[in-house]
Amino acid sequence: MAAHLISQLRYLGVIPQTEYVEYGFEIEEKDKDPRLIVLMIDPALFKKHDLMFQEAPDLCYQKLLLELRSETADLPVSPRFSVTASDIAHYRELHPTIKSRKIGSRK
């Protein structure tokens, strides 16, 4: 999908579920009805990959942008898809975090 066709990409928020955490986005495109896209993250991935809950919305946003770049009229982005360990690794490469902070240094 050409980025210029999206007039607005809006983050709707977090929706905790029993088996996963959902992150909702709404896409508004010129001359089309708004689309709801939901990305899901298995809660176990947060601990396993040291992913902070505060990072998850941006991770989902970045993954959605990648999906939208490869979208075609014949193959639209799925309205629901999962974030994988591979997606987290890719995000970490582009957004390194400071691991040197110690828990005891917080007041």
Over which residues does each language-model region extend?
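Short, charged/polar N-terminal "headpieces" of proteins
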Residues: M1-R35
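Generic detection of intrinsically disordered/low-complexity segments and helix-coil linkers/edges
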Residues: L5, V14-E19, M40, E55, ...
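Acidic, low-complexity intrinsically disordered segments
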Residues: L45-K107
